[in-house]
From Swiss-Prot:
It comes from Neurospora crassa (strain ATCC 24698 / 74-OR23-1A / CBS 708.71 / DSM 1257 / FGSC 987). This is Multiple RNA-binding domain-containing protein 1. The lineage of its organism: Eukaryota, Fungi, Dikarya, Ascomycota, Pezizomycotina. GO terms for molecular function: RNA binding; rRNA primary transcript binding. Residues 5-78, 308-384, 489-560, 599-682, 704-781 form the RRM domain. Belongs to the RRM MRD1 family. Residues 277-288 have a biased composition (Basic and acidic residues).
Amino acid sequence: MESSSRIFVKNLPPTITEAEFRKHFSAEGRQVTDVKLIPARHIGFVGYKSAEDAARAVKYFNRSFIRMSRISVDIAKPIADSKPQHKSPSKGSSKDADPKNAPKVLPPNTKVTAAAVPKVEAAPDAPKRKLDVLDEADPKLQEYLDVMGAHPSKKMRNAEGLPTTVDEVLAPAVPAGLEDGESDDEYEDIPSRTHNQSHTADQEMVDAPLAASAEPSESAPPVSLDATDDDWLRSRTNRLLDLVDPEDAAFALRPAASGSAAVSVPSTSVENTASAKPEEHPAEDSREMAATSTHDPESAISLIEKTSRLFLRNLSYTVTEDDVREHFAKFGILVEVHVPLDSKGHSKGFAMIRYEKPASALAAFQTDGTVFQGRIVHILPAAAKRENKLDEFALSKLPLKKQQLLRKKAEAASSTFNWNSLFMSQDAVNTAMAERLGVSKAELLDPTDASAAVKQAVAETTVIQEAKQYFAANGVNIEAFKTQQRGDTTILVKNIKNTTIEELRTLFEEHGTVLRVLMPPSGTIAIVQFAQPVQCRTAFARKAYSRFKDSVLFLEKGPKGLFTDNVAVPTDARPAGVQKPSVADLLERDDAEEQLETSSLFVRNLNFSTTSQGLTDAFKHLDGFVQAKVKTKTDPKKPGQVLSMGFGFVAFRTKDQAQAALKVMDGQVLDAHKISVKASHRGLDAAEERRREDMAKKAANQGTKLVVKNLPFEVTKKEVRTLFSAYGKLVALRIPKKFNQSSRGFAFAEFSTAKEALNAFNSLKDTHILGRRLVIDFAQAEDIDPEDQIAAMEKKTRAQVNKVALQQLTGTGRAKVTIGDNDEDEV
């Protein structure tokens, strides 16, 4: 059974309030996502962020005291779980426990008829009496009635409307409020449920939503006197909470996944959250919530197969898009995750998700009623997303330039392709360099100069290097620009001229909270970080290709993991300046010890008895300590309990503090185990791992020769020499030619030292010349050892011999075959 993030509490004080209940189970910084309290039954439910938090809460609060009551805490059982077996009755009560002798309990609002009343069998020797038929002509009966009618209280009985005659006594009861002659068809006879009728948990799951949605005012069925607290709770519990609207009842008419949801009760009070706030559904979100045109599970499944979208309700108000994506990504690839936020940036308690394949959406739909972050999530099919597609007929009437602009703006939000995140337009680079040199762009770009392309390339290289240094000084991970994954909170803003940071902040704050805006002194590129992904997407869609001052904004989604720290820079803080390196710093190779790329540490070889609290106690004395956590898994033999996996993670504020902690704690003994501390590295995709392996090989075999690819065919050898000689002394430069003496599109540049080659590689790897981005790499080292050359020649010769032998074997299959005798004598 999958561990739940909800706990069940029994034996609560009868006068405890909801605020006290929440405060008690939020002790020691525990994050409570849901609270359901039933003071009359002394029970309650508490939801936590994760199953590990719930397991720790059970271990901490079980058999503890609230006031003078010792509470019992356990993991909440699933909805589809079978009812617990009652304790075996004693011998004295064996007769009463017999189902045949047990009294039948009729459902409420049941009209009792003579046929429904069970007949009591008399003893064999008892005299038989006729009680069903009374003879009103019997003189003794009339005498008895007359005598009884002479009693002084007869008038009082008549005044009160009490029955005084046999007809009145035996007359059937008429419901109050009905006059003679009125129809009482609305009062239906409800047949009593027989005890030998068996119902599975799945059938109860189907019947409960119908009863809850069709007759909400109907009282719960009575429970026998010997019922336990669990039986009483189940009789009062709606299987799917009060989340099912009448129009959405059809979507809930199916059993939830077995063993994956916790028992709860319908909430009749205000939502129990730390930031209690109603679910405000804006018009644009309510239109896309759930489809209400279908009323049966088959229609719901067919709708999911068409749209692959789901609507999630009853989510925690602290849930994020990453939490929803991580929880539902196990069913398939998620294309879209949308969690609406209120004006304060908090979740509204519902979300929309869309899968790549309908089968994945159907698998996720089957988890309706399961527990997610301590709350029972309700899943409904969602209608297709409304997209404002461009009308080709109306678009054709616009000018061509306007058509292209509208198409670019429509494709900007969904396009993830970009060939170089640090690419800057030549006009912006030339403007920045002209302002720095104090000249006009016409003077900078001399038409009589043959090396104008080289000047632009050098200017772009200078601006890019300054931007990299500025971003690195302000907490930006420069290596993140090489990744293909796009983030959801950052935007790269380009094509900006004569713009300040305050103007950019004012421009983007119209769509949400801006955490920080970074723009290098050149003013050619800027990074804008938002607090919420929804705000970032809105700003990107509104501002892409929009006019700002005298130019058009070019926006790109920032790469994932762009910032090395998650601490937001205050709005009034000024970015740090750029420290310009000296010539000696550029020529010196950094041989210092490799620094950590993360502020988290990986701790292995932990004792299985070591808990997160024990790991915290071992590291909390170190400077910059944030948190420590031991990785756990669910115990298959003991549901609801967790087991340590023997390793954990420790987070620090900065990389330097993590580096110092690694040196101090590596090799220390914790709970009789010598722990091993290393830097924590996140899993990379195959492309990134292959890229890092290639870089490691290149770093190990760095030489003095560079290969320059994607070279424009129009560029000359003189221009290439001018470009590379600015970063070191060139020993040789070779541009291979075709038979017509034109360039083949690549070149080889050899420097005098490896340091100069490395400086040229780092400086020119993002440079463009004549509109082409230079792809620079270290050339493969030449074999100097004669033995290596001989071995390579032998290998090449063996390959040629094997190829010839293979051709001989496969070529004989086409030999001509003669059938019959062609040398027949002529007649």
